Every structure is written in structure tokens, then in C-alpha cells.
Amino acid sequence: MRKRKLSESSLKGWLYLLPALLFLGVFMVYPLVDVFVYSFEEGYNSASQTYMGVGSYNYSYVLHDPYFLQAVKNTFILVIITVPLSTAIALLIATGLHAVKPLRNLFQTVYFLPYVTNTLAVGLVFMILFKKTAYSDGFINLIIKWFGGGAVDFIDGPYWAKMFVLCFYTIWVVMPFKILILTSALSSVNRDYYNAARVDGTSKRRIFMRITLPMISPMIFYLVITGFIGAFKAYSDVVAL
């Protein structure tokens, strides 16, 4: 009797999941399999939807393409720099916001604005800040000149300058979401842990390392994973710049 109830419960659960599974199968699994099959077809004619043969030429061509290899290099640099930095800075800001009670909601709104701003609009702002033209060196170059440095063309100039702008832009765009998530995570930590630690005379640094970080570590892990995924898929950011 108990096994029958369990089987009925399992069947009911699978029926609830069926629409979502069908959606995933039709719109995610099938396209992935289809594209994987297409990748081995050589000499494909889109008009007649025919191909000449099957092989690994497409993979060989891509892996020997200098533009593709450069794109892979740029992507890995972007991921390695932006994900740890954006998460660490967001954690510092979220900790500060959590500690400051007055105007907390105002600061949260201000920090969240870049996340809801149009990507192209943000890209134009960065162009004005960094791009060197015949009429203006850009706002950042003006600051550099004030300190006695020379103007740098961050957009069309050296490789390091372009990567700096792209990394800075990516961190600035993704950080608001991370601040929001981490602020919520910090607010959910039970205050009794902090009160007990203060009674024992524990320092603030030790409280942060031993209580705060372990309690919000699942959210940090989530942000790191989603940050890696988002950075590997970054395309609109480059187009906007």
C-alpha cells in the first residue's frame, strides 16, 4: 500500500514536471544536438539544405583561425579578471551597506541603477569617458593629464588599454546584481550568532571570517558560477563599446 502511494506521488510529480521537461527538450536539448550534428557537415548549402560530406574540417578551421584563438584568449582574460574582482568588490560594498543603517535603501538604489540601464547607453557613456578623438581626449585622459601623464587611446589604442576598458565596463555592469544578492544574504544571517560572538569578545575580523563568510558562502558560490557563465557568454558588452 505504501509503495503504491509512493508510485502515485512520483507519477504526479513527473506530470507536474512534464511541461518544463518538454520545453527544455524542444528549445534547448534538440537545438544543441542539431547544431552538434551540423558542425560535422562539410560543404553545407543553405539554399538546398544539402551537404557534401561529413568530417572535422569545421573544427580544424576554427582551431587554426587566429581571430578565434584571440577571442578565446580575450575571453579567458576577461573571466579571470572580472569574476573575482567584481565578487570581492560587491562583497565589500554589501558589507558596508549592511553596517550602515541610515540611507541604506538610497545607496542600494544608486548601486543598482547600472544593472537596469540600457547596455548601449552605458557603452556610449564609457565611449565618452575613454575614447580619444580629434576634438577631445576623453574625461579619463583629462584626469591622467592633471597628474602629469600622457593621453592614452583606450578604445582604439594598445591591447592592454582596450582590455582594461572592457574589464572595467564588465565589472561596473555586473556588480549591482551581486551587491543586491549579497546584501540580502547578509540580512538573512541570524543575529544571535553575532550577539554570542560579541559576548565572547570576538573581534570584528574574526566574526566576518568565521560567521559571516561561512553563512553567505552558498550565495558567493552562486555568484561566482553565474559570473563565469555570464563572462564566457559576453558579447553585447563588446559591441556596446
What are these regions (language model features)?
Residues R4-L241:
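A structural signal for multi-pass alpha-helical bundles of membrane permease subunits
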